[in-house]
Curated annotation (Swiss-Prot):
Its main location: nucleus. One of its GO terms (cellular component) is RNA polymerase II transcription regulator complex. Composed of three domains: a modulating N-terminal domain, a DNA-binding domain and a C-terminal ligand-binding domain. 3,3',5-triiodo-L-thyronine binds at residue 91. It holds the Pfam family Hormone_recep. Belongs to the nuclear hormone receptor family. NR1 subfamily. One of its GO terms (molecular function) is RNA polymerase II cis-regulatory region sequence-specific DNA binding. GO terms for biological process: cell differentiation; negative regulation of transcription by RNA polymerase II; positive regulation of transcription by RNA polymerase II; retinoic acid receptor signaling pathway; thyroid hormone receptor signaling pathway. The lineage of its organism: Eukaryota, Metazoa, Chordata, Craniata, Vertebrata. This is Thyroid hormone receptor alpha.
């Protein structure tokens, strides 16, 4: 039974791959635009890797201050974190602005979309480094 199930899965996969249509001209153009927007707004190179060095050894070594909720914050680590995150978030916003029709959305909808996807985009970008 398991062998039949595996065979049917393979056959279905082959059928799906054979019947999948090629993207049309408009879809290829959209793919090109998104790819170009990504390339223009994605940070590359060793400078990003240099900035993140504080993560492994330095956390907990700087001055620690309590927050109003009673949590403790390492000011130096937080400062380094914001130095990295602020430009990363700015690049995600710039990426979104380069996407077709994004700027046509109402401002409130743009903000909702950016809040919902910002961390995912930054995670994907970090994963491919």
């Amino acid at each position: 039974i398991e062998e039949n199930r595996q065979r049917r899965k393979r056959e279905e996969m082959v059928r799906t791959l054979q019947t999948r249509p090629e993207p049309n001209t408009a879809e290829w153009e959209l793919i090109r635009m998104v790819t170009e927007a990504h390339r223009h707004t994605n940070a590359q190179g060793s400078s990003w890797k240099q900035k993140r060095k504080f993560l492994s050894d330095d956390i907990g070594q700087g001055p620690v201050v309590p927050t109003s909720e009673g949590d403790k914050v390492d000011l130096e680590a937080f400062s380094e974190f914001t130095k990295i995150m602020t430009p990363a978030i700015t690049r995600v916003v710039d990426f979104a602005k380069k996407l077709p029709m994004f700027s046509e959305l109402p401002c409130e909808d743009q903000i909702i979309l950016l809040k919902g996807c910002c961390m995912e985009i930054m995670s994907l970008r970090a994963a491919v480094r």
